[in-house]
């Protein structure tokens, strides 16, 4: 199945800041997004309040996304302490 990706405004703002502050992490996230398109079910599903969402860790940062049909909705990218 081919997936489309939608980015939330919050995620786009986070990436814009990250591009200026940490180019290496920015590039890691871009690479992982390309992998995500091919196999979004591979990543860990969340539970409780965040049931229905999945996560990808990048060091101390967490990317949270949701799969809806053939669309992957990227919700947020934030420090682990602020994500949950």
List each language-model region with its residue ranges.
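A short, surface-exposed loop/turn module that caps and links secondary-structure elements
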Residues: 31-56
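Residue-level signal for pocket-adjacent positions within structured domains
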Residues: 13, 31, 41, 45, ...
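Enriched for short, Lys/Arg-rich terminal
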Residues: 2-5, 9-10, 16, 20-26, ...
């Amino acid at each position: 199945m081919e997936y489309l990706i939608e980015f939330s405004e919050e995620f786009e703002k986070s990436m814009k800041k990250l591009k200026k502050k940490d180019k290496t992490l920015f590039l890691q996230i871009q690479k992982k997004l390309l992998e995500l398109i091919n196999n979004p079910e591979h990543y860990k599903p969340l539970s409780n309040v965040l049931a229905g969402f999945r996560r990808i860790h990048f060091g101390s940062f967490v990317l949270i996304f949701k799969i809806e049909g053939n669309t992957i909705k990227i919700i947020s990218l934030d420090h682990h302490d602020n994500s949950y």
